[in-house]
């Protein structure tokens, strides 16, 4: 294949990438007859000559798509596409491929890629407002101010290594304690409960409770604070909820408020749980105790990860916008699953991505600390992983993401017609 044909290929992929970005993912139906005019007009504006599937509607889209999938999954055939010199007009490749020679037509104008590759611009975001999907909203919608709406503390409870989950704690707390002074910190609807279970008397004095991470992003307004022995309607064993009027007062302080806040009164309290520990001064000896904070809980301003990242606080962080590529790939992914090629293609794309990154390194190698936790079709997450490589020059990171974006765009367009024989 000639150098000019590879440059034409690069320019056409730039055009396809632009086409994918500008389309609405909800209405795009593939390269049908209705799409030919829009794509042809854009090619004309970009000074790109017509390609086979645009100028000749008789070209079987299914055959073309099948050839492309074979092309992109064959490392020996698409190896040159992964080299950074793919965008270099001074390099003359010595490779050939049926897909390129059959469906990509050469043109005589100055390749668009020669201009674009010098801009060093990611140009990845298709619109000013990221697109939201309902399934990713969880408790709160990504664009809502997170501290404007009440939230149930039991929905925030996060289990970590060595810690029992919130609901499993119900059975544990109902079982008589086997030892003295077993602290706990749990949550239910409209209430946070903390205290110490014991099978013997606990003397009056100062006790400290570490606020777990899930509760440290909360503030409460109009709260009653009192002793209780109930958790989700189940009696907590090893605590005393009874009190008399003659008992010395029990108070507590939080890091954000130096005042002593009373327990077991009609006072309505408002305070923040962020900043560290709750210090409680027990006024009278008890055989274990449990303090309930019952009120309206909200997320602390600027403390929720959702405030900055628009990620749900109840699930693993996910990108809410994938530059619309995910919508285009839905049909292709369905076909891969239907024919049992999903894992095969995923492995090929992982190998392709690693090979691409390796080719940009000097000397060629996978950068230290690079590990993808998302599938190949979650482009924005992979782009974020690549852009986070601080030990790689920023311009190189940009070029890698742009290069991978072009390849993903090509898959998004041609993959819609993939029908394995």
UniProtKB/Swiss-Prot annotation:
Against Gene3D superfamilies, the record matches this protein to: 2.60.120.170
Q: Which GO terms describe its molecular function?
A: host cell surface receptor binding; structural molecule activity
Q: Name one GO cellular component term.
A: viral outer capsid
Q: Which UniProt keywords apply?
A: Capsid protein, Host cytoplasm, Host-virus interaction, Outer capsid protein, Virion
Q: Which Pfam families match?
A: Phytoreo_P8 (PF07124)
Domain of life according to the entry: Viruses
Protein's GO biological process: fusion of virus membrane with host plasma membrane; symbiont entry into host cell
Share what the entry says about its subunit structure, partners included: Homotrimer. Homomultimer. Interacts with host peroxisomal glycolate oxidase (GOX). This interaction mediates its relocation to virus factories peripheral to host peroxisomes.
Q: Which family does it belong to?
A: Belongs to the phytoreovirus outer capsid protein P8 family.
Function description: Capsid protein which self-assembles to form the outer icosahedral capsid with a T=13 symmetry, about 70 nm in diameter and consisting of 780 molecules capsid proteins.
Q: What is this protein called?
A: Outer capsid protein P8
- Native source species: Rice dwarf virus (isolate S)
Q: Which gene encodes it?
A: S8
């Amino acid at each position: 294949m000639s150098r000019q044909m590879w440059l034409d290929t690069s320019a056409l992929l730039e055009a396809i990438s632009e086409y994918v970005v500008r389309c609405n993912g909800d209405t795009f139906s593939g390269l049908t007859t209705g799409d030919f005019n829009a794509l042809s007009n854009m090619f004309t504006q970009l000074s790109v000559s017509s390609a086979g599937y645009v100028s000749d509607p008789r070209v079987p889209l299914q055959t073309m798509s099948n050839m492309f999938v074979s092309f992109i999954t064959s490392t020996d055939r698409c190896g040159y596409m992964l080299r950074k010199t793919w965008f270099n007009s001074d390099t003359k490749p010595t490779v050939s491929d049926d897909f390129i020679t059959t469906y990509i037509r050469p043109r005589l104008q100055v390749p668009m890629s020669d201009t674009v590759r010098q801009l060093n611009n990611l140009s990845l975001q298709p619109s000013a407002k990221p697109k939201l999907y309902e399934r990713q909203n969880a408790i709160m919608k990504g664009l809502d101010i997170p501290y404007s709406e009440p939230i149930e503390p039991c929905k925030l409870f996060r289990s970590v290594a060595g810690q029992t989950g919130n609901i499993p704690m119900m059975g544990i707390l109902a079982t008589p304690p086997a030892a003295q002074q077993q602290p706990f910190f749990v949550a239910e609807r409209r209430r946070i409960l903390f205290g110490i279970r014991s099978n013997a008397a606990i003397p009056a004095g100062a006790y400290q409770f570490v606020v777990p991470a899930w509760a440290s992003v909360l503030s409460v307004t109009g709260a009653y604070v009192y002793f209780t022995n109930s958790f989700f309607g189940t009696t907590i064993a090893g605590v005393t909820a009874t009190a008399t009027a003659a008992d010395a007062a029990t108070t507590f302080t939080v890091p954000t408020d130096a005042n002593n806040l009373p327990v077991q009164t009609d006072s309505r309290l408002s305070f923040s749980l962020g900043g560290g520990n709750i210090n409680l001064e027990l006024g009278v000896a008890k055989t274990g105790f449990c303090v309930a904070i019952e009120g309206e809980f909200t997320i602390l301003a600027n403390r929720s990860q959702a405030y900055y990242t628009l990620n749900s606080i109840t699930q693993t962080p996910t990108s809410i916008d994938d530059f619309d590529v995910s919508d285009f790939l839905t049909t292709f992914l369905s076909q891969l699953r239907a024919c049992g090629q999903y894992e095969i293609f995923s492995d090929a794309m992982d190998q392709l991505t690693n090979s691409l990154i390796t080719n940009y390194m000097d000397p060629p190698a996978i950068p230290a600390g690079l590990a993808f936790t998302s599938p190949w079709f979650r482009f924005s997450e992979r782009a974020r992983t690549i852009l986070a490589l601080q030990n790689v020059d920023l311009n190189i990171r940009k070029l890698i993401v742009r290069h991978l974006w072009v390849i993903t765009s090509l898959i998004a367009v041609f993959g819609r017609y993939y029908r394995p024989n």
